[in-house]
Structure formats: C-alpha cells, structure tokens
Amino acid sequence: IARADSYDGPLADVLQSQFEHFRPHVPVAGKRVLLKPNLVEYHKAKVINTDPRFVGAVIELFKREGAAEIVVAEGPGHWRNVQFLVNESGLGDVLRAHGVRFVDLNHDEPVKTLNLGRMTGLDHLYLSQTVLSADVFVSLPKLKTHHWAGATLSLKNLFGTLPGICYGWPKNELHWRGIPHSIVDIALTHTPHLAVVDGIVGMEGDGPLNGTAKPVGAVVMGADLVAVDATCCRLMKLPPERLPTLAMAAMKRLGRIREAEIPQLGEPVAALATAFEWPPKVEKQLLTAEQAATAS
C-alpha cells in the first residue's frame, strides 16, 4: 500500500517505488503488457471508472520498465459504443498522449478455453485473444463498493475481459451463472500477473455506478489478487471473509484472504482505512458471520 493524496502528484514515481518489490516476480522488460482498467460508464459528476490519470501513470511506469508494447483494453458491460466511452471519460486523451492503443474486448476474437474453475458449471470460457496473447496481464480497478458483490476490485474487474459478442450486455450469462462463481472461474482460467488499485478516490454506497466519491489516498499493488482485494476491503472496513467472491476464491486456492497470511509492505492498513458506506440491501448478498467462519 502506498499513500497518494492526488492524481496530479508524481504518481508514476509512487508506482515505481511499489513495483521495486514485484519486478523479480513480474518482469516487464521487452514484454507486451496489457492493462485492464475499470471502464463501465461515464457520468461527469461520478467517480465510476479507473481515473485516466491513474492509467497514464501506470503506462509511464511500464514504459520506464522497458515494456516492448503497452495495450489498454476493456469490454464494458453496459455501453456498446466503447470508443465514445473512451473519449468522453478522458482516457482517449491519455492514450493518445502516450501513443498507446485501445482494444475493445467486447468485439475481440474469442478463444474457446478450458474452464479451470468449473464453479459455473461451464466446461469452457470464451476469452479474448488480446488478453491471452499478452505477456503480462494487469488488472487496474477502482476501489468501489458493489450492490451485488459487496465490492468490485481486481477480481470483479475481470468480467470486462470476456467478449460481449459471446456473453451479451451486461455479460448476461455470467450473471445468471452467479457473479462470484463467474469471477472465480475467469480468474482461475487466466490469472492476471499483477493488480494495481486506484484507491486515491473510491466510491462508497450504491456502487458500482450510483455511489458517492470517497477519498482514501491509497494505491494498492500486489501479485496475489485475492490478497489485494481482501486488503482493499480492509481499507474500506468491509469484512472480506463475508464477500462470496473472496471466500470462494480462497477456498479454490486462488490466493490468500487471512490478514495474518498476507505479506504486507508499505503503509499499514490502519493508517489509511476509512469506513465506506455499504450498498443498500447488500447484506442479502453477503455470507453471514457464521457462514464466513465455516468457509474459512
């Protein structure tokens, strides 16, 4: 965890200091790097998406690290006119300034891939060729609550990697199969190498679209996405053990959820933790304390 109070500060320097700990495990020099931000909808007064300045700082980081190519890609679940969304959100300006191309994953070439999770009952998943062909795959979510999942972080962000031409808008079949089940299947089938969470300003309340801005001043980076998301929940003072996605992911050995088992560097959670307002009626979507204890 690193402290970053503003998007206008030296974010690339902050990220580079964090990445020192991950360079041996996630080498990017000479590699093709795919960045997957959270780009859902654009509303001028809301903090729905990974901030374009944050994406720009991550691009700068990997340029410094010697990446051969950097691609930003997303398959939004709501808007079909993705290029309009990219431009209106401000992401287009950032990508043009850095000379980085954007790929609409909703219309990317689907690749039939053996489902390694099998939580949904699906034998195969159709993944994006652009995602599968990347040497380094990075999830760049926004720190947000979610009215169905409890929180939407680096794992939930993977919904946008599956082509809409196969799964519909908003990835209907995956919702019918169960959001936690689908997330875990996707993550086990093609696991990102790194997560970098935009927690400078998050969203609390009725996320992922209708919540309110919540300044936190944190950037969270990690190679274990379950640990990253559990840590982000603790920053939001949400109980990660009660989120079905994280409980299920830990059960499937995708990563670590217990705080005592997560090697934590940088700022301590307590230094930046701030209570987020929960989404209305989200209790119905969470595990009870008893269920969480049994699952763990």
Regions inferred by a protein language model and the residue ranges of each:
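N-terminal and secondary-structure boundary signal
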Residues: 1-296
